[in-house]
Every structure is written in C-alpha cells, then in structure tokens.
Amino acid sequence: MTPLALIPGWGFDARVWQPVVERLAAEFAIHPLDHAPSATLPEGAIVCGWSLGAMTAMQLALDQPERVARLVLVGATPRFVQAPDWPDAAPPESLQAFAAGIAADPDATLRQFAGRINLGDDRAAPLTRRIAALLADRRADTATLAAGLARLRDLDLRKSVAAIRQPTLVVHGERDVLMPVAAACWLAEHLPNARLEIFLGASHAPFLSEPERFAALLRQFAHE
C-alpha cells in the first residue's frame, strides 16, 4: 500500500487525524510523524501536514525528495509570522503572547489556542468539543510547545518552494482566522506543481470540518 505520512499541527498529536485515518486506513499504510524535519520517510510517501505540520512536510520534500511522492498541505503557509513584505500572516506579538503563556500555564494556553482553530467555522461547536477532548487527556509538553513556536517564528520557506517539484494539493478553509487564505493562494501560485482546494464555511482545520470530503480528495489526488 502507498505510505501516507500524517503530521499534526502545533500542540496536537497524531490523534487529530483520526477521522481521516478511519476513512483511509484500508487503502494506505499510515505513518504518523512528529514535527522533526529529520524524520526518515518510507519511499514513495504521500506526506500530509497541517499548519506547522505542513511546513514540516515542505521541509521533508526539500530534504528527502526521493522519498516524497506527493504533498498535501492543510492550513499552510510558507511563513507564519508577518513581515513587511508578508502581511497575510500572524502578528509577531501574537506568537510572543503564546510563548509567554506556554511558560506560565501551558495547558490553559493550549486550550486558548485550540478555541481559535474553529472560529467562524460552520461546524464550530462540535469541532471545538472534539478538539477539547483531544487535549483533555494529555499534559502539555512545555519544551515541545516552545520549540514548535520557535519554528513558527523562524521558518521562512518562501525562497525554497520553487524547488518543491512534487505534485501538491493545497487545502485551506475559507474562514481560516489563524492563517489567511491568501497564504494558501500564494503557495498554489509559487509551487511548481500545485492545485488549491478551498473548503467553504471551514476555518483552520478543514479535514475535521469535512473529513469525508477531505479523504475523498486525498484519495483522488493519490491516484492522479
């Protein structure tokens, strides 16, 4: 079976992908990954990353091109933090506030962040309950969270994406308040072999908003 590597977003583990795994496990060999850009991939893998995980996925495609067959980038951006030439991103002070919160009360800060993931989503209430359940039975790892924030602060892949030659599916929620849809449009335009799918009525986690549609898209993309 084709390997499917799944990389979660900041603050989450592999369980966030469960609705997708339930729909695709019979067709793909599932490989949960963390955010380490040095992870060794199985050959011919489809690498699917969400948010920070999408940035890791792009790094893997650059560093291990012979192992990455295709990319799926969800809620993605080449640069998370605003810059003078990059306005469609998070203000630096928001990351600073999260860093301070992680140092003071990591569990409360993670819950606060999770509450923003589904802002504006048509299915916000059930999605927020699902995400809260994912966070309820695990303690926040302060060092891991801080390292993830540092990567979000420092990573800038804008000059590198032209070297990513793999077929790429960019999936973004129309109402994403954490990462403007303009960032996904930029990626779709600058990646050499990409197409963009916008989920209307969805926010930062479209694969949770519409898991059936997302799984069908990934399945179709894998066989193109």
Task: Locate the predicted segments by residue.
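Short beta-strand/loop motif that positions the catalytic acidic residue
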Residues: 164, 170-172, 176
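Catalytic histidine-centered segment of alpha/beta-hydrolase-like enzymes
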Residues: 202-215
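Gly/Ala-rich beta-loop-alpha elbow adjacent to hydrolase catalytic centers
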Residues: 49-53, 57
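Conserved alpha/beta-hydrolase "acid-adjacent" motif
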Residues: 177-183
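Flexible "cap/lid" loop of the alpha/beta hydrolase fold
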Residues: 62-63, 67-104, 144
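Conserved alpha/beta-hydrolase catalytic His-Asp/Glu region
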Residues: 104-155, 159-160
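Catalytic histidine neighborhood in serine/cysteine hydrolases
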Residues: 184-205
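Conserved HGGG/HGGXW glycine-rich cap/lid loop of the alpha/beta-hydrolase fold
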Residues: 1-39
